[in-house]
UniProtKB/Swiss-Prot annotation:
The lineage of its organism: Eukaryota, Rhodophyta, Bangiophyceae, Bangiales, Bangiaceae. Its EC number is 2.7.7.6. DNA-dependent RNA polymerase catalyzes the transcription of DNA into RNA using the four ribonucleoside triphosphates as substrates. SMART domains: RPOLD (SM00662). This is DNA-directed RNA polymerase subunit alpha. It holds the Pfam family RNA_pol_A_bac. The gene is rpoA. One of its GO terms (molecular function) is protein dimerization activity. Residues 242-311 are annotated as: Alpha C-terminal domain (alpha-CTD).
Amino acid sequence: MAQFQIECVESRTDGARGQYGSFVIEALNQGQGITLGNALRRSILSDLEGTAIVAVRIAGVNHEFSTIPGVREDVLEILLNLKEVVFKSNNQESQIGRIKVQGPAIVTAGLFELSSDIEVVDPRQYIATICNNTIFEMEFKIEKSCGYRLAEKAVDELSLDFLQVDSVFMPVNKVNYKVEEVRVGTNSIKDRLILQIWTNGSISPQEAISQGATVLTNLFCSLRNLDFKSVDTYRNKEDKKISQVLIEELQLSVRAYNCLKRAQIHSIADLLDYSQEELLEIKNFGQKSAEEVIYALQKTLGISLPKEKTD
């Protein structure tokens, strides 16, 4: 078992939508620092799940290039603002959020009507400004996933009048790592891994490391007890399957086919008992027919008959 320590040497909160953590992992064997740092970085950035708005329906709006009377922002600006909203959620199912505000008012994410298992990380996140007594009404679909998803033109039957949004699901904004050599004792040199993580506030840097490590653990656990099938076993199964093929599959000429049938050769297994030399000994089976069979075997099944009979 690996013997090393991990310590958080710096931690801070940068507003409602930013957390930073710096961690030191030591002492690792030489080379393990890069291995662990690179694997953790890729896993944390690519595999962690987050929650984001994926589609929006605004009352009276048909496309993203529309404007809304009484609202300062056009629809495209509102969609960009919604893209920046960060959520916390453990629910894997799609959710619907709503908002209905009568102006004049400033619309923020804190006014969203959400289910109890979804939380807005920054309630002050700006969405739009209503300049008069206009009623601003909107529904939006929230999903949990990984990575980044571009707005899809093809929507499901439940979203016919929804506008699609480019969605950022990644809860971690940035990961850096650095490996330093440290001397342990008099002769031993080890690796020290320094890991820096910036999140969007939906998870802490500590949670990011834990979740990233869990992903890697589950990935590598499947490699611990692999059931390797021998090449010979595989070949035997394939040979058995091929040998059961009937000679009709070779699509031979009528003359060659009838000669084989009269010689009681009905399958590839029967044919493999013959060499090229023995084929010519079959009654009325000439050189041309033999060449036809040899070619068909090679082309159809990749099989070559031996030229001479082997004892």
